[in-house]
Regions:
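Structural motif corresponding to the intra-repeat A-B loop/turn of tetratricopeptide repeats
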Residues: 510, 514-517, 551
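Interfacial juxtamembrane loops and adjacent helix segments
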Residues: 144-157, 263-287, 299, 310-350
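Alpha-helical transmembrane segments of multi-pass inner-membrane proteins
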Residues: 2-26, 39-52, 72-83, 94-107, ...
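Long, contiguous interaction/recruitment modules in multidomain scaffold/adaptor proteins
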Residues: 364, 372-468, 478-482
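Transmembrane signal-anchor hairpin modules in multi-pass inner-membrane enzymes, especially those
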Residues: 1-80, 86-93, 100-127, 179-194, ...
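A membrane-periplasm/extracellular boundary helix in multi-pass inner-membrane enzymes
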Residues: 134, 139-142, 204-207, 212, ...
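Membrane-interface anchor segments at the N-terminal boundary of transmembrane helices
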Residues: 27-45, 340, 347-363
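Transmembrane helix-loop junctions in multipass membrane proteins, especially transporters and channels
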Residues: 58, 86-90, 113-114, 141-148, ...
């Protein structure tokens, strides 16, 4: 086997593994940092093998298109958040995942040259979505509990553990399953692709995700209007036949569920007509989201230019809660601190500022302007593909106006893959072959090599830092060498505050055993450094309050506790450390 053939095979194997892992990462039982490291490593290896295959083939370089160029600009700005984030500990995972998305897009641009290859991997992605739908439906019967998670209040979640996450994933793939059904030429493919959309609709119904069901309705309406506009009566007929079949299957499954021994949280299934009443009514969720959105607006106003860095919303939320939401915050303030703003545009604005939001909007404009161009000028079959592809991306974006299932659950990778598919069709069928001029060969190869080197260095550093923090420092397995471990962690992430916080925690523990004032001085010195690195991490106030308590400075200790308890997690931590017989376990 030649080098070119080996690189070609390895690239496709890596892409296959990446597509499967991005959909089923929860099944592998990896910790968050481990799954992030693995998927970014797969993207890096895919880019490297694609570059080797590309260079040995001596094929003509694709020009950098408007869609891919605008997305890489946005992802690049998010990666630069390393330099403007208010907390590197909270941002480093999201930054690396943004980098992984850019790396995947570059690898796809190098490797996928044939529409046949693109269709093959789309088939794989849709098969993964169909299988997830089967799992979501089977969840209702609570069988195979060793491999299929139990539902929460009869709400299907797939392997994701949350109904809205499942809904986002399925909505991203649903329209394409319909396209592949109508475009399939063999009976076997038609049967498989005919089953997939039915399963996805049933899974979305059983998920009880109101937002997901609403977006599904919008997608179905768009598809029906498209078929009517095409005057394709056979497809309109098939559309209504499928809806009838789904209805029959749904009530049949409900009947079987009632006959089973599954404990039902509801005496009757929640009806879509009860969207504004009952326990799962939309008003409470909407009120919560208004708080999230207005709090995000408050953060954006203070950090409007560059934002606070990816993944920092949860950290700043307690500091801004109530400033912008005085009329909504009552009864909410101490319920939960959300991990994100539940809106992709607000989240991008708070994370990356007006610069990042502007780049993302430019990317969306590029996607829809080129999509509209293809719908008007491409051959008929390509127009169909572009319509359903654009509808998939649109469904994802609409659902993410009330969610933010993008970075924290690896959905950036299937999103990037579908964006590339549209980009591929644009490059193939546009009369104007390039919106951006071709790049010099030396610069082209140099930039890609730099991406690989920087990505590899960043991924290795990230893994080493996270492994030290979560495997040795926080669990206390390396207490004897804690100073050495924290110093090593600081070399991997000089701007991170967690090593200093853990060192402070250890010094306070030492003081409890040996009340030496010098130990408190050392602990306070660590906290001063932490305050410079991560000023919004309220854990430092818990530790500083303990130091002030040891020093009998009760007034200042009380003020520090009050400030820290704005965060519900810190309230629980502070209570545990005050009342527990072993505060080091808190």
């Amino acid at each position: 086997m030649t080098t070119r053939q080996a690189a070609h095979s390895v690239a496709f194997i890596l892409l296959t593994v990446l597509v499967i892992f991005a959909s089923y990462y929860t099944v592998f039982g990896l910790k968050g940092y481990e799954s992030t490291t693995l998927i970014v490593s797969l993207a890096l290896a895919f880019l490297l093998s694609s570059l080797i295959s590309f260079r040995t083939q001596n094929t003509e370089r694709y020009p950098l298109s408007l869609i891919s160029f605008s997305l890489i600009l946005f992802l690049g700005w998010a990666v630069l958040g390393h330099f403007y984030t208010v907390d590197q500990d909270n941002s480093m995972t999201a930054i690396l995942r943004h980098f992984g998305g850019a790396i995947l897009l570059l690898g796809l641009s190098l490797k996928i040259k044939e529409e046949e290859h693109l269709q093959r991997f789309l088939w794989l992605a849709l098969f993964c979505a169909g299988l997830m739908s089967v799992i979501a439906v089977v969840q209702q019967f609570e069988v195979f509990s060793a491999i299929i998670p139990k539902t929460f209040r009869n709400m299907s979640t797939g392997f994701y553990g949350h109904r809205n996450v499942l809904a986002t994933y399925l909505l991203l793939h649903f329209p394409l399953t319909i396209y592949f059904y109508f475009s399939s030429q063999t009976i076997n493919k038609k049967i498989i692709t005919g089953i997939m959309p039915i399963l996805i609709v049933l899974a979305l119904i059983f998920s009880r995700s109101r937002g997901g069901q609403l977006v599904l309705g919008i997608q179905l309406l768009c598809i029906l209007v498209y078929f009517v506009q095409m005057k394709d009566h056979s497809k309109v007929r098939d559309f209504f036949i499928a809806l009838g079949l789904i209805t029959a299957l749904y009530f049949g499954l409900i009947y079987l569920i009632k006959l089973s021994e599954v404990d039902q949280y509801y005496s009757t299934p929640p009806a879509i007509t009860n969207v504004f009443t009952g326990e799962l009514n939309a008003w409470q969720n909407l009120a919560n989201r208004l708080v999230f959105w207005e709090t995000g607006w408050g953060i954006f106003k203070d950090y409007w230019l560059t934002g606070t860095g990816s993944g920092t919303y949860e950290l700043l939320f307690p500091m801004y809660l109530g400033k912008e939401t005085s009329g909504l915050v009552e009864g909410f303030a101490y319920v939960a601190n959300p991990p994100h703003s539940h809106n992709i545009l607000i989240q991008i604005a708070t994370d990356t500022g007006v610069i990042g939001l502007g780049l993302f909007m430019a990317f969306l404009i590029a996607v829809y302007s080129r999509g509209i161009y293809l719908l008007r000028n491409a051959p008929p079959e390509t127009r169909n593909f572009v319509f359903f592809l654009t509808l998939s991306l649109t469904g994802f974006m609409i659902h993410n106006q009330i969610e933010y299932n993008w970075i924290q659950i690896h959905f950036i990778y299937p999103f990037v893959f579908l964006v590339f598919a549209l980009d591929f069709m644009d490059r193939k069928y546009s009369l104007k072959k390039s919106s951006v001029k071709k790049i010099n060969s030396l610069i082209h190869n140099g930039v890609l090599t730099a991406f690989i080197l920087v990505g590899t260095f960043s991924t290795v550093n990230y893994y080493k830092y996270q492994a030290l923090i979560y495997e040795k420092i926080i669990p206390g397995t390396g207490v004897a060498n804690l100073l050495m471990l924290t110093n090593e962690a600081k070399t991997y992430c000089p701007g991170c505050g967690w090593p200093g916080l853990e060192m402070t925690k250890n010094l306070i523990s030492q003081y409890r055993r040996n009340p030496n004032p010098a130990i408190l001085v050392s602990a306070e010195t660590e906290l001063k450094e932490v305050a410079l690195l991560t000023p919004f991490n309220l854990r430092q106030f818990i530790y500083l309050a303990e130091i002030r308590s040891f020093q009998a400075n009760w007034d200042e200790a009380k003020k520090l506790y009050v400030q820290a308890f704005k965060n519900t997690k810190m309230k629980a931590l502070g209570g545990c450390r005050i009342f527990s017989s072993n505060p080091d376990k808190c």
